[in-house]
Design a protein with these regions (language model features):
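Active-site neighborhood of glycoside hydrolase catalytic domains
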Residues: 1-53, 57-69
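Carbohydrate-binding surfaces of carbohydrate-active enzymes
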Residues: 3-4, 31, 35, 43, ...
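Short glycine/serine/threonine-enriched helix-capping/active-site loop
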Residues: 53-54, 75, 117
């Protein structure tokens, strides 16, 4: 079947049915690729190993992908993108980092058991621009607990150490370029200590009192 990329018409709009067809085509192609990789991994992994990937993306049916190929899905949580250095950050009605609660609830709707593949631990940016400021003292703890409170059963931080080369040289991690002790690694240790006292919540299923429908 031939699927055409949607193009704007004379009225500067697209055909909504063509857009839907194209989006479904992109989603199906991506899901098929994930399924191919998942099947290979499943043949060789240990029984206790899990298969996951991180998302979520608007042009991908993550619900189907999770059912077809994954044990659970994971999410990349970067709340300080809400304060990025562009026009979007100050757009009217922008809920800033408060919308991350909605994002986490959306992930939970895809996979009741889910994890955080990348929890923000430093300032974020590429070699072309800086997008998000450094977390303030205590913010890593706040975001980690927010993820867990929304049902995350797994949290990992991106990245361990800020890389010294490549496109993401300004994407800071727990450690700075020097790899030396800093306040962020001390905060991670404190987070670990707090989570040791909360380990009984691991594996629990989040009980939501409110349901959201997004059309």
């Amino acid at each position: 079947q031939e699927v055409h990329a949607p193009r704007k018409t004379y009225s500067d709009s697209t055909n909504p049915h063509e857009v839907l067809d194209y989006t479904r085509f992109i989603s199906q192609g991506a899901r098929s690729f994930v399924k191919m990789q998942s099947d290979i991994i499943a043949r060789y992994k240990k029984p206790e190993d899990f298969i996951t990937t991180n998302g979520i993306f608007g042009n991908l049916d993550s619900h189907k992908m999770t059912r077809e190929s994954l044990d659970f899905i994971t999410y990349d949580s970067y709340p300080n993108f809400a304060y990025c250095l562009d026009a979007y950050s100050d757009a009217p009605g922008n809920m800033k980092d408060r919308k991350w609660s909605r994002n986490l609830s959306t992930v939970r709707s895809i996979s009741p058991v889910f994890g955080i593949m990348e929890q923000q631990s430093g300032a974020n940016g590429w070699n072309t621009r800086m997008e998000a400021p450094t977390p303030r003292p205590g913010q890593m703890t706040l975001w980690t607990m927010q993820s867990i409170a929304h049902g995350a059963d797994y949290v990992s931080y991106f990245r361990w150490r800020t890389c010294t080369m490549g496109t993401e040289i300004y994407w800071h991690g727990i450690l700075d370029y020097s790899g030396r002790e800093n306040r962020r690694i001390r905060e991670v240790r404190e987070i670990h200590r707090k989570l040791q006292a909360m380990k009984d919540v691991a594996g629990g299923i989040y009980q939501a009192r409110v349901g959201m429908i997004r059309d």
